Every structure is written in structure tokens, then in C-alpha cells.
Amino acid sequence: MNDYQIMRLDAAPRVLFKFDGRILFSSDRFEMVHLSLDPGASMELHTQPFDVVFYLSEGSGILTIGLEELEIQSETSVMVQAGVTRAWKNNGKGMIKILVCKLKE
């Protein structure tokens, strides 16, 4: 077994969402998911039992955290603590791409 793992985005397993999500890495302690949301697409408000760091690599969108809506621009990261409600919405004209890092420990 190797001391490393390589995963190409186009070969990564899909997550079960209504938009394109790919699992780039997953372990008991950490998971990395790449999300792509088309213009107008949004995810439902939800919570997770672990901290999550989002990195918006392309586009801009609305990140709802609790009762607050934040306009997030590309090349920005946001950490949301475990148990806090969150959701993304693409309110722009182009696709947004988000790297989701789940800190499960």
C-alpha cells in the first residue's frame, strides 16, 4: 500500500445531491468534497456533526450560516462549526465551485 492517495476530479465518486459533487478523499477523520453549482442552484439548509471549511475557488455565491446570509467571493475560505445550520446558493450567472473540507475529529 502507498503512503499517498491520488484522485482526479473526473474519476472521483459522486455524492448523492441534485448538483455535481465529487468525493476527492475520505477517511474517519477528514473528507474533501468538490461541489459545482449551476446558476440558480441551491442546497437545503442542513447541519453536520463536525466542523466544515469551505473554499470557494470559482464564482460567487450566498452562504447561509445560521440566520445570516453572506455574499462569498472566489478565493475565499469560511469555517463553520459543528451543529450550525448552513447552505449554499449560486445567485450568479456562472457556475460556482466549492471545496468542502469536513474535519470529522
Task: Map each language-model feature to its residues.
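Conserved short histidine dyad/triad with adjacent acidic residue
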Residues: 33-48, 82
